[in-house]
């Protein structure tokens, strides 16, 4: 009896971890942080309970989009070294289970957001899930090298959703936060695509290095990084502690551009990986700086 229990435990743990991975938790963490940032810097007050509900809905919505993405992309995930161990290709989770979970979480997150918070936030959450799942995953990703650029709209919406959870309105401040994430997304993913362009080519995914070459991709990364640096100066206009924010944002942005420049002049894969890794830390730190500078 005890041996049976011991054999069931690892299986159960693997299944639970499979479900968790299906929700793309690394993306979820960033989505939640940017959503909370929108809530914190928005004018007015939000009841703590409503804030928690809004945060949970944003997290569930992100997880729902991740599950639908993994369901649809399971065929190409199985072909790529980087993604072959994801829950569906590895056999941890069935494809049918993934889409069912994604749809259920989508309905729950949007419905609860509409009822408990406000309709505008619920509608924006639905747009974010739908854009990532339908427009990016099912249409853009396999058809155009601009997949990441246009698809970035979905990932850039959470700070607006957080803002509208408090104000029930969209403002220029929330749009600036949207713009930061929107412009950050392409160089972040293009750095990853430089690392794995041969796998994308094998899976017939038209990422920029596959369709336009490595050199062109490097130019795009550098240009977008410079534009991002300029845009990240804008929150200083409306944050309470402008000096503190700019003291953080300027060196962070300069380092981002420096990494992009190193990618541009190098053929070393370690530079590509360093750019990708830094870009993740960069956005986390930048949005934490925005939160701190709002007090």
UniProtKB/Swiss-Prot annotation:
GO CC terms of this entry: plasma membrane
Keywords annotated in UniProt: Cell inner membrane, Cell membrane, Heme biosynthesis, Membrane, Transferase, Transmembrane, Transmembrane helix
Superkingdom of this protein's organism: Bacteria
EC number: 2.5.1.141
Gene Ontology molecular function: protoheme IX farnesyltransferase activity
Membrane topology: Multi-pass membrane protein
Broad enzyme group: transferase
Localization (cell): Cell inner membrane
Transmembrane segments: 27-47, 48-68, 93-115, 119-136, 147-167, 175-195, 219-239, 247-267, 275-295
Broad class of the protein's primary localization: membrane
Catalytic activity: heme b + (2E,6E)-farnesyl diphosphate + H2O = Fe(II)-heme o + diphosphate
Family: Belongs to the UbiA prenyltransferase family. Protoheme IX farnesyltransferase subfamily.
Other information: Carbon 2 of the heme B porphyrin ring is defined according to the Fischer nomenclature.
Biological function: Converts heme B (protoheme IX) to heme O by substitution of the vinyl group on carbon 2 of heme B porphyrin ring with a hydroxyethyl farnesyl side group.
Full protein name: Protoheme IX farnesyltransferase
């Amino acid at each position: 009896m005890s041996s049976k229990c011991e054999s069931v435990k690892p299986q159960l743990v693997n299944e639970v971890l499979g479900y968790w991975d299906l929700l793309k938790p690394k993306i979820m963490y960033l989505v939640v942080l940017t959503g909370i940032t929108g809530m914190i810097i928005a004018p007015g007050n939000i009841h703590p309970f409503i804030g928690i509900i809004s945060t949970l809905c944003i997290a569930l919505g992100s997880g729902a989009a991740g599950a639908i993405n993994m369901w649809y992309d399971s065929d190409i995930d199985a072909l790529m070294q980087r993604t072959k161990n994801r829950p569906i290709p590895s056999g941890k989770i069935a494809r049918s289970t993934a889409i069912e979970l994604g749809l259920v979480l989508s309905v729950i997150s949007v419905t609860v957001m509409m009822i408990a918070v406000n309709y505008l936030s619920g509608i924006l959450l639905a747009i974010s899930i739908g854009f990532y799942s339908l427009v990016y995953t099912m249409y853009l990703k396999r058809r155009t090298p601009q997949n990441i650029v246009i698809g970035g709209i979905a990932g850039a919406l959470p700070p607006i959703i957080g803002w509208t959870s408090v104000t029930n309105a969209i403002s220029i401040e929330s749009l600036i936060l949207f713009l930061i994430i929107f412009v950050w997304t392409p160089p972040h993913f293009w750095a990853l695509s430089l690392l794995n362009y041969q796998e994308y080519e094998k899976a017939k995914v038209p990422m920029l290095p596959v369709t336009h070459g490595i050199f062109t991709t490097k130019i795009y990364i550098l240009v977008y990084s410079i534009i991002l640096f300029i845009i990240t100066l804008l929150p200083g206009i409306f944050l309470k502690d402008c000096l503190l924010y700019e003291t953080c944002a300027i060196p962070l942005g300069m380092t981002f551009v420096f990494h992009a420049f190193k990618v541009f002049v190098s053929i070393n894969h370690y530079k590509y990986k360093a750019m990708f890794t830094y870009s993740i830390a960069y956005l986390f730190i930048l949005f934490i700086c925005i939160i701190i500078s709002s007090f």
